[in-house]
C-alpha cells in the first residue's frame, strides 16, 4: 500500500493527520535504513568469509527478498514495477548460484558497500538531521506560543509587541524547518528506488561475470539487466523532472502558503483554544478545528485527551459568530460563537489577530481572503501568431540543429529567450523576427519554444482531458493505453489537435536522429510531458503524476503514424487495437521463472595461453580455449555475434522508428555503471542517462580477475542450418553481438498461436524448424528478433503493422 503524498500546505496547518502521515514516512525511512544496514552487513560477510560463502549468499538473498518498496501515489509506472520486483529476482538468482560456489571479486566492496553506505549516511542521515531540527523548532514554537497566549492583555503595549515579534519569528523558523523536512523525506523516499537498486545491480553483474562457472547464468541475466538498467535510467529521468517541479512548488509555497487549497478541503482549519467553565474555575482547552462554510459545520477535535477515555471529534452547527470585546476578557484574539447543539456562548481564542480575522471572515459568510495571488509569468495564447512562432522554430531546428547533441535538454540563456519572445510577440509587429540571425542559436530557439508551450493559458492537451490521459497511461493493459490515448487525442479542440500533431511530428523527426542527438522517445517524453500536459492545481500529488504525463508523450511519439492516420472508430468506449488470444498486459521482467539448464563441466585454462587459440563467443566476452567444442547442446539457442561484423545471412539489428526508418539501437553498458560506482559516484552522467555514448564500446574493468574456462557446447538453432553455427571461427574474426532493442517487450509467457503468422527472415538461413519447448531458448530467440519490432514497453504493441 502506498503512502499518501505530503502536501507542503499541510506544513502550515500541522494537523494531527499530517503528523500521522509524517510518522508513516519516518517509519518507512527507518525500515529502509535498517534494510541498508542489513545489506551492508551481509555483503561484508559475503566478501570476507570465503569459507562460509554459501550460507552468506543465502542470508543475503533472504534479506533482499524480504524488502518491498513502498511508493508515493496510487500507481507505479512499468519501470517502477520492474524496480519494485527487482530484489525478488536478485534473490532467486543468488539461490541458484549458491551451489556453484562462485568466487567473490576483490572490488565487491566498492560496488556494493560504499554506495549504500554513502546513501545511508548522506541521504538518510541528512534526513534524520532535518527531523531533529523540525522537532526542536516545533517544540520551541509551541512552548513559546503557549506562554504567549497566556499573556494578559493588560501588559504594556511594547511588551506585547515584542512577544508578537518573537512568536512570528519562531513560527517562521518552524514552518521553514517543516517544509525542508517534508521535501527531504519525500526526496529520499523517491530516490531510494535507484540509489539502492543500482549498487546491488552492479554488484550482481560483477559477481556473475567474474567466475567462469556462471557463464550460462550470465547469458540469461543480460536481457533482464539491460531492461532493468533502462528502467532505472527512465525512473531517474522522471525523478529529476519531478524534483524540479517540486522545488518550484516549494518556492511558491514559501511566498504564499495558502495558495494550494484542494477541492473538498474545509474552508478554514487550524488550532483554537476553547474556554471551558468548571465549578472550580475556568480552563482553556486546545482543539483542532475545521469549518465548512457551505454547511456551517464546525468540527472540533480535542488535543488534550482525558485519562481513561478517548474523545472523538465534535460536530457543531454554527448559528452566528461575533468578535469578543478586548475589555471584556483578559485573553487576546478571542471571539464568541453560538451553535445549535450547545446552549449559551462558546468563547474561542485564535493564535493571532490575523488568524482571528480569517476565522471571522469564514464564519460570518464574507468572502474569504486566504492568500495574496502569486505573480505569474505572462500567459501565452494558442493563436495564429503562436502557430507561426512554433512553425518557424521547428523549421530552423530541423534545418540547422536536428543533430545537435542534447537537443531540447540543453537550455539557452534566459535573457536571449526573453528577448526573442518579446520581439516575436510584440503587439506592434508580431512575428517580425529573422530566425536566421546569428543572435539566435539553437539552444535559445528550443528554450523559447518550450517556454511558449509551457506558459500557454491552457496546456496543449487541455485541463479537461488531463485526468483521462493520466488514467490511460496508468493502465497495465498495453492495448488499452494506445486505444484510449488515440481516442482522447481526437477529443481535443481543433487548434489544440493541430498544434499537437505539428509538435509530435517534429519530435518524431528529432528521435530519428537519436544516434547523433541522443534524444530517444523516452527522453523527449521527460522534456515535453510537463510542457504539453500539466495539472490545474499545484500540489505534490499532481507532481507525482508527471512520470505518467511523460509516458503519454512517449506513446504519441512512438505510435504517431497509427494515431494520426485517422480518428478511431466511433464507439462508446475508447477503441482497442485488434484483439489477441489473451489481452497483453504489462508484467515485470523476470529471469527466475525460466527452466534450469543442465550445466556443462568447465575446466579452467591458464592465463598464459596464446592468443591464436579458438575463440567462442558468449554475451559477456570471449572464452578462449584450444579444445574443439563438442557438438549438440541440451537446449537450442540463437547464435551470438559481435557488433561490427557483417553476416550475409542476417541484417544488422536496428531500432525501427514510426515512419519506417531504421536506426541502430543503443547499448546499455553496465560496465560504465560499475566504473562509476567504483569511483564512489552515485550520479549517472547526462550522456549515460539520455542515451548511448557515440563510439562507446564494451567497457572492461581491469580489477576483475576472470579465469578463462574451457569451452562449453555450442548451441544449434532448430530453425536454421545447424552446421552454420558449429563452425569454428578464424582467430582474427570477431562475431557480432545481437543486442535487444532499447525498450524490449515483455518476455514470452504463453505459447499462443498468432492470428497472422509472419515469416521470420534474417534469423537463420534455411527452413524454420519446430518450436522449442525451452523457455530460455524461446526468450533468447525473442530478443534476437525483437529489434525489428517497433515501440517500447510503455505502450508497444508487437504485431501492429500500422
UniProtKB/Swiss-Prot annotation:
Residues 265-368 form the PH domain. SUPFAM superfamilies: BAR/IMD domain-like, GTPase activation domain, GAP, PH domain-like. GO terms for molecular function: GTPase activator activity. The keyword Transport does not apply. Residues 380-564 form the Rho-GAP domain. Residues 616-627 have a biased composition (Polar residues). The record marks 409 as: Arginine finger. Keywords: Cell projection, Cytoplasm, Endocytosis, GTPase activation, Neurogenesis, Synapse. Residues 716-732 have a biased composition (Basic and acidic residues). The keyword NADP does not apply. It is found in: Postsynapse; Presynapse; Cell projection, Axon; Cell projection, Dendritic spine. This is Oligophrenin-1. It comes from Pan troglodytes. The gene is OPHN1.
Amino acid at each position: 500500500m502506498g503512502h499518501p503524498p505530503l502536501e507542503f500546505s499541510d506544513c502550515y496547518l500541522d494537523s494531527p493527520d499530517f503528523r500521522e502521515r509524517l510518522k508513516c514516512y519516518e517509519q518507512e525511512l527507518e525500515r529502509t535504513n535498517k534494510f541498508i544496514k542489513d545489506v551492508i552487513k551481509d555483503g561484508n560477510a559475503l566478501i570476507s568469509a570465503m569459507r562460509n560463502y554459501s550460507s552468506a549468499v543465502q542470508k543475503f538473498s533472504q534479506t533482499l527478498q524480504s524488502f518491498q518498496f513502498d511508493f508515493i501515489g496510487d500507481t507505479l509506472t512499468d519501470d517502477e514495477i520492474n524496480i519494485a520486483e527487482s530484489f525478488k529476482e536478485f534473490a532467486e538468482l543468488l539461490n541458484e548460484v549458491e551451489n556453484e560456489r562462485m568466487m567473490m571479486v576483490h572490488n565487491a566492496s566498492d560496488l556494493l558497500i560504499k554506495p549504500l553506505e554513502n546513501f545511508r549516511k548522506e541521504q538518510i542521515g541528512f534526513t534524520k538531521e532535518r527531523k531533529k531540527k523540525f522537532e526542536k523548532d516545533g517544540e520551541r514554537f509551541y512552548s513559546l506560543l503557549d506562554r504567549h497566549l497566556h499573556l494578559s492583555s493588560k501588559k504594556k503595549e511594547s511588551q506585547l509587541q515584542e512577544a508578537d515579534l518573537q512568536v512570528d519569528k519562531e513560527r517562521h523558523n518552524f514552518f521553514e524547518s517543516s517544509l525542508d523536512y517534508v521535501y527531504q523525506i519525500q526526496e529520499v523516499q523517491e530516490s531510494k528506488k535507484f540509489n539502492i537498486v543500482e549498487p546491488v545491480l552492479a554488484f550482481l553483474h560483477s559477481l556473475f561475470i567474474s567466475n567462469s562457472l556462471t557463464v550460462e547464468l550470465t547469458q540469461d541475466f543480460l536481457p533482464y539487466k539491460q531492461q532493468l538498467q533502462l528502467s532505472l535510467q527512465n525512473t531517474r529521468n522522471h525523478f529529476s523532472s519531478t524534483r524540479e517541479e517540486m522545488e518550484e512548488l516549494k518556492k511558491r509555497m514559501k511566498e504564499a502558503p495558502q495558495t494550494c487549497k484542494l477541492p473538498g478541503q474545509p474552508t478554514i482549519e487550524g488550532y483554537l483554544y476553547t474556554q471551558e467553565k468548571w465549578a472550580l474555575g475556568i480552563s482553556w482547552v486546545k482543539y483542532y478545528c475545521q469549518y465548512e462554510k457551505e454547511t456551517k459545520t464546525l468540527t472540533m477535535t480535542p488535543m488534550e485527551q482525558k485519562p481513561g477515555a478517548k474523545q472523538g471529534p465534535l460536530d457543531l452547527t454554527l448559528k452566528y459568530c461575533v468578535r469578543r470585546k478586548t475589555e471584556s476578557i483578559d485573553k487576546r484574539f478571542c471571539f464568541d460563537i453560538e451553535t445549535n447543539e450547545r446552549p449559551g456562548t462558546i468563547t474561542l481564542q485564535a493564535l493571532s489577530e490575523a488568524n482571528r480575522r480569517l476565522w471571522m471572515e469564514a464564519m460570518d459568510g464574507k468572502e474569504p481572503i486566504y492568500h495574496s495571488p502569486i505573480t505569474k509569468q505572462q500567459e501565452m495564447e494558442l493563436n495564429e501568431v503562436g502557430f507561426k512562432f512554433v512553425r518557424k522554430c521547428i523549421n530552423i531546428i530541423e534545418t540547422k540543429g536536428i543533430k545537435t547533441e542534447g537537443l531540447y535538454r540543453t537550455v539557452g540563456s534566459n535573457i536571449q529567450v526573453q528577448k526573442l519572445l518579446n520581439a516575436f510577440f510584440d503587439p506592434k509587429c508580431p512575428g517580425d523576427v529573422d530566425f536566421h540571425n546569428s543572435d539566435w542559436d539553437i539552444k535559445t530557439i528550443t528554450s523559447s519554444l518550450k517556454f511558449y508551450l509551457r506558459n500557454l493559458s491552457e496546456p496543449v492537451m487541455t485541463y479537461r482531458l488531463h485526468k483521462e490521459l493520466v488514467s490511460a497511461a496508468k493502465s497495465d493493459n498495453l492495448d488499452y493505453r494506445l486505444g484510449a490515448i488515440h481516442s482522447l487525442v481526437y477529443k481535443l479542440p481543433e487548434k489544440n489537435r493541430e498544434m499537437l500533431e505539428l509538435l509530435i511530428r517534429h519530435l518524431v523527426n528529432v528521435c530519428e536522429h537519436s544516434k547523433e542527438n541522443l534524444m530517444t522517445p523516452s527522453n523527449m517524453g521527460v522534456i515535453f510531458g510537463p510542457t504539453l500536459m500539466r495539472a490545474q492545481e499545484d500540489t505534490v500529488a499532481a507532481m507525482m503524476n508527471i512520470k505518467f504525463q511523460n509516458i503519454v508523450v512517449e506513446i504519441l511519439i512512438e505510435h504517431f503514424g497509427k494515431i494520426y492516420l485517422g480518428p478511431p472508430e466511433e464507439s462508446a468506449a475508447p477503441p482497442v487495437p485488434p484483439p489477441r488470444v489473451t489481452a497483453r498486459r504489462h508484467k515485470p521482467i523476470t529471469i527466475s521463472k525460466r527452466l534450469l539448464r543442465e550445466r556443462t563441466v568447465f575446466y579452467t585454462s591458464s592465463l598464459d595461453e596464446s592468443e591464436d587459440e579458438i575463440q567462442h563467443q558468449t554475451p559477456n566476452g570471449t572464452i578462449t580455449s584450444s579444445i574443439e567444442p563438442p557438438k549438440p547442446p541440451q537446449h537450442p539457442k540463437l547464435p551470438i555475434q559481435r557488433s561490427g561484423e557483417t553476416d550475409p545471412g542476417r541484417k544488422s539489428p536496428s531500432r525501427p522508428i514510426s515512419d519506417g526508418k531504421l536506426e541502430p539501437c543503443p547499448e546499455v553498458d553496465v560496465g560504465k555503471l560499475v566504473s562509476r560506482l567504483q569511483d564512489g559516484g552515485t550520479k549517472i552522467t547526462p550522456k549515460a542517462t539520455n542515451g548511448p555514448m557515440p563510439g562507446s564500446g564494451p567497457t572492461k574493468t581491469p580489477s576483475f580477475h576472470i579465469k578463462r574456462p574451457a569451452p562449453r557446447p555450442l548451441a544449434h538453432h532448430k530453425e536454421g542450418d545447424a552446421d552454420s553455427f558449429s563452425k569454428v571461427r578464424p582467430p582474427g574474426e570477431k562475431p557480432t553481438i545481437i543486442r535487444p532493442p532499447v525498450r524490449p517487450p515483455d518476455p514470452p509467457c504463453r505459447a499462443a498461436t498468432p492470428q497472422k503468422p509472419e515469416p521470420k527472415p534474417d534469423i537463420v538461413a534455411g527452413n524454420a524448424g519446430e518450436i522449442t519447448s525451452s523457455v530460455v531458448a524461446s526468450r533468447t530467440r525473442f530478443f534476437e528478433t525483437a529489434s525489428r519490432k517497433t515501440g517500447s514497453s510503455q505502450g508497444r504493441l508487437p504485431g501492429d503493422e500500422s
